[in-house]
Amino acid sequence: IVRDIDAARDHVHLLFYIWLPDGNGCKIAEALKRAAVRGVTCRVMADALGSRVLIASAHWKAMVDAGVHVAVALPIGIPLLRPLSGRLDLRNHRKIVVIDDRITYCGSQNCADPEFRVKPRYAPWVDAVVRFEGPIARQNQHLFAADWMAHVDDDIAEILRRPLPPAGPGLI
């Protein structure tokens, strides 16, 4: 993912349920900062609960300072008042990366080191992430755009109207 972010020319969109300020999480944040500084539009969204440690960290602020557009999915607000305004357990569990509308990653892997365990009694488990290239990236672009525009006053629908990049050789 870092290599693809470093090669991005137009935009990078990321959405993670859990994004931690650990080794892998910081590598992604650093790559996003580099991309934003060189003029790539970077939009990232992280779940308010699953990514709360990163969101409250200096890494999040450093991304903003570098020009990365950030959004928090499903803000919690004041936890004691949350039952009055909605369910705390409804979270955005997506893990999506879209780069230049031609590369996408998706799967069950959060943005965290492999050793990360939320609940040790359930671990170890195996997460997977798959890299796709070509027109299929547009599907994840739609998912990201829907979540982004639901939380941010930033209409990115124009990206969805662009011609699709040509498909390359694929595996059948």
Regions found by a protein language model. Give the residues of each.
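Charged, low-complexity intrinsically disordered terminal segments
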Residues: I1-I172
